[in-house]
Structure formats: structure tokens, C-alpha cells
Amino acid sequence: MNNVTKQPNKDYSYLRHHGDIDAAQADARIDLSVNVVDNTPPQWLRDVIAEHIPHLHSYPSEQLHQRVKEGIAAHHDIEARCVLPLAGVAEGFSFLPQLFSTAGLRTAVIPHPGFTEPEWVLRRARIPVSTQTLQPPFELEAPRGQDADSAPGTRQLWVIGNPTNPTGQLHDLAPLAEQLADLDSTLVADEAFIDTLPPQLQTQHSLVHRAATTTNTIVFRSATKTYGLAGLRCGYAVAHPDLIEQLTHLRPHWSMGTLQLVALDAIYNPSSPTHEQAKQHREQIQRDVIAHKEHLIGALTPLGFDTIEGHAPYILTRTPWGPHTAENIRQQLAAQHISIRRCDTFPGLDASWWRLAVRNPATTDAFIDVLTQALNNAHTQP
């Protein structure tokens, strides 16, 4: 593990590169770069959203907002005052600088490879950031007393994806949360992908219940990935009521639009007419991710790809080539409208790594056919 402290004059703009950019650049017909599980919201959810379009002349309802809080709370068996609907997890990350300042923390810690948006937000706010670059298989290392940045008395903000994007690693964060509590530090767990996993893994690894009852843990969740809602921005935070109140005061009025609230209500509210459909959809996605991932890895392995074993609706795989050749092939695929998430913008990785979204077998087979053809036609060297 390597620790790297902020360099004041370094350009960190690469941290804002996300999979949607790769998809747009390729004008993708086969999109393997964006981690949204479905390429469209389910029909029942589209119908619910469409029903409310005629009512957009009205401001978002506070009653609906409260109902969404109560529905999400019931979904997790926590109190509604521990929930805050968000315009996607990205909005939650936008709160980090203020949380850091208010809590009197001294440094932020970001393990990598990991989702880069939190680091970009913190660095833009000129908050000291210590990155921890993990080596394959990218298992998390907790702070150690002899490390300067984690010595007793140093109050930290840790931000970790669980499962982590792009590695797919699922961490046991409970011991880390306990250790950080002893240091009077804060843990933010980004669980944007966790509801694509089997329920038993969610129960074992989610910090939702800890977040609702302690003041040093915040969880961000997303409906984007499982329900195909990236364009609508639907998520929520779970935290102690005091922290939820603090986050609420950071937001402008009417920060959640009507259609966002309607979608969240349809998905999570146990009294919603679509609740059972949402549950069935979620369970089907969980089964599909396992089966479709196995198909994808099975197709890549004979071609020499080495895939990290992870728990997510995407895989991180090392290509059989060096960075230059791997990027050339990725660009060849992009020219044929197949998008692959480049990984050299993830600290700790280079262009020899690809992140691939898990798709249905037909889509995977179409990708493999084009990839195989590109390899047969290419004159490459490592």
C-alpha cells in the first residue's frame, strides 16, 4: 500500500472522467463502460413516472418527500429521520467538504483504485487528501497506529465504495468503522451497487443500520444502477438524525424534483402499488448479475484476460497486453461503437486494465465476436 499526500499544483481533472464519457465518445451501440445494469427503466416504473408528468406545473410536494423518507426507512427497518433522498449519490459527495469542516476533521483518506468523484470534490475544496493505493486483489487495509496520518488524535474522513468501483471488492467495513469511531473520525460508505448483490451479502456488509444509530458513519445508496435511472438522479443518504439535519441544511429548497421522488416512492415504499414489482425486479437483477458475469468472464479467460474476483455488476480485468496495445484495441472497439471504460484515470491502474459492465449473454457474445476479429486483424506487440 502506498500513501500519497496532496500535491498543491497537480492537475486532478482526470478524476472527473467517468464511464459516460467513454460511451459518448464511442457513440456506443454496445455500452460496456456505464455501470447501469439495465439499458432502460422497467416498464412499470416508466409508467409511474409518465403518470406524473402532467403534474409538473406544481412544486415538489413536501408530503411526497416525507413519504419517500418513510418508504426507504421501512425498506431498511430504520427511522425515517435517518433518511435523506438525494439527487444521486453524487449529490451526497458534494456535501463532503462541509461535513469535513463542521466535524473538525484534519485529513481525508481515499483508498484506490476507487471511484474518483469524492477525491475530486475534496481536492477542489482544498481539503488535505491522503490516498492509499492498493495492489491486486485490492483488499482494504485499515489504518495503523504507526502511520502518521492515522495516529491517535488525527481525525479523518474515510470515503470507501462497497463494493468498490472499479475493483468490485466487497469489504468488511464494520471493524474499520469501529476503529474510526475510536479516533473520533468519520466513515462514508458508498453502497451505490450493493443492492445488485444477493440479500445475504447485503446483510453481511451494509452499514445502513450502523449509520442510522451512530454519528461517525454515513451511507449513500443509489437507485440508478438497478433500475436504469442514471438520467433521473435518484439516491439517498442514511445517517444519524443529527447528521441528516445537517445535510438537509446544506441543500437548496426543492432540491428533489417530483419525478425523482415519484420514482423512489414507487421503488421503496411498501404501500406503493408497484412495491412487489420493484422487489421482483431487484431479485431478478441479482440473479442475472451472477449468471451474466460468469458468462462474461468465461468468454474473456480463453483470450488471456485475468479478471479480479469481485461482487458487482461489472468486472475489472487485466488485458493480456501492455498499456499501449490495450488502449489501441480499446480505441478500435470504440470506432465500432463498443465502449469500454478506460482505467488509467483510476489511481493505481493503467491502460492495460479494462472495466466492463456485465451485460446479457447476447450482448457479451456480440462484444467478444468484435474483439476476436480485432485481435485477428491487429498486428500488436506488448
Which residue ranges define each predicted feature?
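N-terminal "arm"/small-domain region of PLP-dependent enzymes with the aminotransferase-like
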Residues: M1-Y59, A74, A357
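Conserved PLP cofactor-binding pocket of PLP-dependent enzymes
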Residues: H17, E309-A312, T317, Q336-V358
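PLP-dependent aminotransferase class I/II
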Residues: P42, Q63-Q66, N216-I308
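Phosphate-binding glycine-rich loop
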Residues: R67-T107
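Conserved PLP-anchoring active-site segment centered on the Schiff-base-forming lysine
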Residues: L99-R123, P128, Q132-Q135
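Active-site phosphate-binding strand-loop segment of PLP-dependent enzymes
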Residues: S130-Q200
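Conserved PLP-binding catalytic core of the aspartate aminotransferase-like
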Residues: I290, G298-Q336
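PLP-dependent enzyme catalytic core of the Aspartate aminotransferase-like
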Residues: A335-Q336, P347-P382
